[in-house]
Amino acid sequence: MKKIALIVAGGTGKRMKSEIPKQFLLLNNFPVLMHSIKKFSHFEKIIVVLPKTQFNYWDQLCRDWGFNKNHIIVEGGSTRFQSVKNGLAKIDEESIIAIHDGVRPLISKTLIDTLISKTKK
């Protein structure tokens, strides 16, 4: 069965009092969201949910960093629930879906694969 990652990254950085949303802050010289996407690079499809106001900024970051991991961008909603719903609406096939927070890049591929294997049982 196809594996799809739905990565939700709709934050604006308000609680951190940062002008830059935390998904775009640098971690080891790379934007945090890029680290998260890379962890799911072995999935057949990656959907990233962002506020529409951040689409152009994300596109520019991808060009600046030469980031070419294949992923689809979907507009987020006013709540996390709505953002996940918007992402799920782009899936039209039976699949195993991993929903992940884009600002949690420290998850290991081993843990991801373990969780996916548990869904198959």
Q: Which residues make up each language-model segment?
A:
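Conserved N-terminal catalytic core of the sugar/cofactor nucleotidyltransferase
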Residues: 33-94
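Active-site-proximal flexible loops/turns
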Residues: 15, 58, 107-108
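Short, glycine/charged-enriched secondary-structure capping and boundary segments
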Residues: 20-23, 61-64, 88-89, 111-114
